[in-house]
UniProtKB/Swiss-Prot annotation:
It comes from the Eukaryota. The gene is IRC19. One of its GO terms (biological process) is ascospore formation. Keywords: Sporulation. This is Increased recombination centers protein 19. Involved in sporulation and maintenance of the mitochondrial DNA. Is probably involved in a pathway contributing to genomic integrity.
Length: 230
């Protein structure tokens, strides 16, 4: 049976069976004065905490479904604490034969606290997530395409979290380690070994790796286009 379509409107949000949409999001934004900060910048730690708190504040508005909100929370933690985005980006833009072993080793060994903080990209990412959580009425004054832009952001974020949830499921139930997908990015590294030389377990991973590789490659290109770090 289809659940009833009920919409509740308050001064700050619009609540539907699927989403809680923010109407005013000024308190979730950051000052625009920040620039890129390197590892030695005294402001770096403060800015990281500011961004992290604002992303986490948006969790209740991502979805009314607990599983989706939990996936968003885990993904934000991963992005801030573990992900080596520069390594991931390097693997996407450099085919197997063009990769430098020295460059790969350097990127792989760079600690999270030693990386440049891309403040501009993080600000745009925060704006993207805000759009996905924000309600914009389609009126004569407000152009339809601007309101539709928020919907696109919401749909993209939903797809991203769905794929991330599938990664978590694969780690838990399909014998694929966390390090393979989210640390080493094994799914982005093409293997030069013939299928006949792979063992049974490795062969089973190939179809799933292809799905994750295609998605993450598309996501990197989307980030390059939008200037974000989704």
């Amino acid at each position: 049976m289809r659940k009833p379509s009920i919409t509740i409107t308050t001064a700050k949000a619009i609540i539907t069976p699927d989403y809680t949409l923010i109407k005013s999001h000024s308190k979730y934004q950051l000052p625009s004065r920040f620039q890129k900060l390197d590892a030695d910048s005294p402001e770096r730690s403060t800015v990281v905490k500011l961004f992290y708190r604002r992303f986490m504040r948006l969790k209740p508005f991502i979805s009314n479904v607990k599983m989706v909100k939990d996936t968003y929370r885990d993904y934000v933690r991963y992005k801030f604490m573990k992900e080596n985005y520069e390594l991931k980006r390097y693997l996407v833009f450099n085919p197997d034969g063009l990769r430098s072993k020295i460059k790969l080793e350097l990127l792989s060994n760079t600690k999270c606290c030693e990386r440049i903080l891309p403040v501009t990209e993080m600000q745009r990412t925060l704006e993207f997530v805000l759009k996905s959580c924000s309600y914009l009425p389609e009126t004569k004054v407000q152009k339809w395409d601007i309101a539709r832009d928020n919907t696109y952001c919401r749909q993209i974020l939903k797809n991203l979290l769905t794929m991330q949830y599938e990664k978590y499921r694969s780690i838990l139930h399909r014998g694929i380690g966390h390090d393979e997908l989210d640390v080493k990015f094994s799914h982005l590294k093409t293997t030069s070994s013939p299928l006949t030389k792979l063992n049974k377990t490795e062969k089973k991973k190939i179809p799933l790796f292809k799905v994750f590789s295609d998605f993450d490659t598309t996501l990197i290109y989307l980030n390059e286009t939008l200037g974000t770090r989704l």
